[in-house]
Amino acid sequence: HYRQGDTLSLTCERADYDGMMQMMHARKNVVLRHRRQKLLTDSLDFDRLYNMANFFDGGTLIDGKDKLVSDWGEYHTETREAKFVFNVKLRSGKDVITTDTLYYDVPTSTAHLVGPSRIISGASVVNTHDGYYDTKTDKAKLFGRSTLVDKDKSITGDSLYYVKNGESTGYGNVVYVDKKN
């Protein structure tokens, strides 16, 4: 069991610590708790010099109603920013975001989606290549020619402002399709 101050603790079945490099290698059933967040994995390296936790054999970060899963990631305990790469899935309530790369800011609960990404929220499906999704407000700013499909309607634009259960707005080369009317 490793404890740093009153905000960080790390438990695992096996750990090696390199005092010279100030690096902890934690293996098997690793649980890193930092404030209200919990990071679960089987392989984690914690760099005490840079306050950086890296997982590389799959991991899950739980932050309130948000649950992030990916093959590889890092969590910076000082800035409380995280990066998730490869097979990323963010569940926020009933909403699901899938992408290849996601940056998550813990204090604001904002996800930055990089590369081909999909947001599924009830009957709505959003496809984008670049965007920011606020999991507290369920609002998104999307770039890179994004598309929102909701039942019989779709909107595509160079950028979109998406509000769950509200109005969405497109900007630049907008195409709106209403299959019902």
Regions found by a protein language model. Give the residues of each.
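Structural signature for solvent-exposed beta-strand/loop edge elements and short helix-capping sites
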Residues: 1-181
